[in-house]
Amino acid sequence: MSSKKSLVQSLFNISKTYSRISGLTRMRPTKSGGIPPDAGDSGIRRRFLHKRAFFSPEIVPKGGNLMEKLRELTLSNNNRIRLDEMLPPPSPKKSSPEFFPAVTVEDVKKLMRAAEMELVKSKLREIGKNWVPYSEFVRVCGEYSSDPEQGNRVANMLDEAGNVIVLGKLVCLKPEELTSAMAGLIPTLEPSLDAETRQEFEQLEIIKSDIDKRADDLVRKELWAGLGLIMAQTVGFFRLTFWELSWDVMEPICFYVTSTYFMAGYAFFLRTSKEPSFEGFYKSRFETKQKRLIKMLDFDIDRFTKLQKMHRPNLTKSGRC
């Protein structure tokens, strides 16, 4: 009898210990969906019948215990520190160079025209000829379009862009060869020869400017002398009119002197083909003095004119040599 009591007491202690551990792992006891416990059964019997094994494996709880475990995990996940939220916000993605905005209808048309032009150029290069008739050229330009007017439009675009050269009824498909041939016909000066002629031109230009200055001084001296003669003539006629003679005598004299001046001006015009004026008289006398100085100094005016056209073709020519 005593052995039975000791066995029951040890079983009771073991059941009490494991029930305490299971109470910590569960928030509430699960309600058994089976037959309700008998009120007459003793607590020792229930604990003995429902006690757990000493080394029971971890079994996933079912029913309400599973829901409670999931709820506990959810609460623990909400309360934990989220390191991903502490990270700085991601930098905005920069638009890559390969990204293109929306293409408009005009852009599509432009791309189509460019592609058509490239196809026509490749087709023209495949011909292998330098010159083709204009009709064949238009036909090739319109091969990639159903519209017959498109060929004329593409042909005009190629002509304006300089890809071909249209000369009448012929079309040059290789304009670079034509331009190189034309450039070969244009004479060019070598750099060394050009430097030598420029230096020679500068020396001749200095001499020419000195001749022009000397001729201008001589002409102005003549003009001042002419002014003195006119003033002396006016003073002499004034004295003869009011002191020596009378107006009746001086009137025909003044008339004939004036007629002489008119005839001299007319003769000047016939000889120089210039207007008989002070400016015309100055230019005529300047050219005369200039030619005289050029001859006296043995200045090569023809060489100077040639070099002037070579190095200063846009120089405006004056009345002087």
Swiss-Prot record:
Motif Selectivity filter boundaries: 247-255
Please verify whether the record's keywords include Repressor: no
- An example Gene Ontology biological process: calcium ion import
Question: What does gene deletion cause?
Answer: Plants are drought resistant and recover quickly following rewatering.
Q: What is the protein name for this chain?
A: Chloroplastic calcium uniporter protein
From which organism does this entry originate?
Arabidopsis thaliana
Q: How is it placed in the membrane, per its record?
A: Multi-pass membrane protein
Q: Which superkingdom?
A: Eukaryota
Q: Give residues annotated as binding Ca(2+).
A: E251
Cite the GO molecular-function annotations of the record: calcium channel activity; metal ion binding; uniporter activity
Which cellular component terms (GO) are annotated to the entry? Answer: chloroplast envelope; chloroplast membrane; mitochondrion
Q: What does this protein do?
A: Chloroplastic membrane calcium uniporter that mediates calcium uptake into chloroplast stroma. Constitutes a pore-forming and calcium-conducting subunit. Chloroplastic calcium homeostasis plays key roles in cellular physiology. Promotes calcium uptake into chloroplast stroma in response to osmotic-stress, fine-tuning cytosolic MAPK3/MAPK6 phosphorylation and affecting stomata opening.
Q: Which residues cross the membrane?
A: 223-243, 249-269
> Catalyses which reaction?
Ca(2+)(in) = Ca(2+)(out)
InterPro entries named among the record's database cross-references: MCU_C, MCU_fam
Q: Does the keyword Transferase apply?
A: no
Query: Which keywords does the record carry?
Result: Calcium, Calcium channel, Calcium transport, Chloroplast, Ion channel, Ion transport, Membrane, Metal-binding, Plastid, Transit peptide, Transmembrane, Transmembrane helix, Transport
Record's subcellular location: Plastid, Chloroplast membrane
Starting at the broadest rank, the lineage of the source organism is: Eukaryota, Viridiplantae, Streptophyta, Embryophyta, Tracheophyta
Per UniProt, the transit peptide runs over 1-56
The Swiss-Prot or TrEMBL record describes its family as follows: Belongs to the MCU (TC 1.A.77) family.
